[in-house]
Amino acid sequence: NNVKRSLRLLLIPLLILISPQAEPSSAQTPQLTSVKATKAHAIISLRLETGKQVFLDKSLSEPRGQACANCHQPEYAFADPRTVSPGAVSERAGTRNAPSLLYAALIPSFAYEDFLTPEGAEVYAHEGGLFWDGRARDLFEQVQQPFFNHKEMNLSSESELAHRLRRSSYSQKLKELVGARDWADDGLVTYHAYLCLVELLRSPVFRPFNSKFDAYRRGDQAILNEQELRGMKVYIEKGKCDDCHPLSATNWDPPLLSDFGFDNLGVPSSGKPDLGLGKHTGNPEEIGKFRSPSLRNVALTAPYMHNGSLKTLKEVVEFYNLRDTPHGRWKTTDFPNTVNRTDLGNLQLSQKEMDDLIAFLHCFTDRHLNTNASHESLNIDPEHAESNHAQSLLFPGWTHRLHRGFKAQKSDN
């Protein structure tokens, strides 16, 4: 983790220049007055509005009735309060808890990287990617999969999705993006729908950075009370939370509160054993490992862990503290051979320290969600287009994809 942080700190000066919290200046926010920039903003604005409509559209499932918003509800930080989410077919349900979509656009692309440990040893590890097992390299891959998963929206093909998009109330907006010449091309119709969803998830609505913790980092030292400050100390030191959910800006500024690495925490079994990352990579040493989530808005996203087996923040903290002690009360875990026995399980936190830590975890809640937790929180501000355009090169790798309709030159790289 320390090596990850030191490498990523090289990026922070550039990130700060376009951070949502950075003070505007002529150097940081040049006036994009060219015709090309104006056109780009218009396209992004149209994508944002269309992406919102796709996100809320219940006609894009079979049978109809299931939308992205069914499993990613604004009042729960765009997560799902149910252990697993029912699909379009009522007797089918997913096997994992639906994660929050907030800050998902900033999760680094799935990669296998080498790191140096503090002792100087070179190790290799997977990090990043979307879904609990990282199987989607980036957000563009992720937004496609739920449409065709038989436990989710249950469409049979891209042709079926394209047909429904052409019959939607927002079809003319989508057609404007696709172009009249290509409107009959199913692949291009769905391609642009995916881009619209990604553009929505990149917008400031999904990366507000306006929690009490953010205000504290910006210099409002009085905003945290004594218990929350004690909780921050527990978080960094005795609780070891900072090891995997660093408070420092290691991969984005403001921090995302995750290193996005993979670990087997030994969570209680729930249903069929889930291979996690190991199924995706085929590596037996990675069986049962899942990606570390961001802790932003964690107080709103219960239940917890990949299988929703821990129901409250209190239970999560108790699990980390007591898992390997005689006081542990949790079921057998699926894959004990790959469980992390070093960093959690017997933290020896007192009840007061656990209470303080929970109080601090509530400081990660974006404050607008406390007052505007509904579909109205998907309101798109025209300035979002400029924000998305200005930051486009710093979002993870999907932005550099070739258009599906282009013929790529073969590369030796």
How would you label these PLM feature ranges?
Residues 29-142, 210-332, 373-413:
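Short glycine/threonine-rich turn/loop motifs
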